[in-house]
């Protein structure tokens, strides 16, 4: 996520061009961690870490009714690309138990990412 026209400047989240990676808080958090690790490696004269990214988005449609999308991405020749067969979307025909589980997973995801961001 280092700017091609401004070395030393890194762009993450909604301001970045991350190919198929969605504009989401989870993606931005993931990108920011990799950028921080890359900057630390540069300062220490070490190789940058291998770029691998994940994204998970949950949406609560109503009480006990959640949906999700998830994917894994990697760097390929300076671009972000999908890892083949890694993108998953909640099935359209999911039953009530599945939707309820997705709603609970979404609440757990929110608690986890909030803790990751703010509890430091």
Question: What does each model-identified segment do?
Answer:
Residues 68-120:
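C-terminal auxiliary extensions adjacent to catalytic cores
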Residues 50-66:
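Flavin (FAD/FMN) cofactor-binding core of flavoprotein oxidoreductases
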Residues 17, 36, 66:
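Short, electropositive, low-hydrophobicity segments enriched in small/polar residues
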Residues 7-8, 55, 88:
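A generic secondary-structure signal marking the coil-to-beta-strand transition
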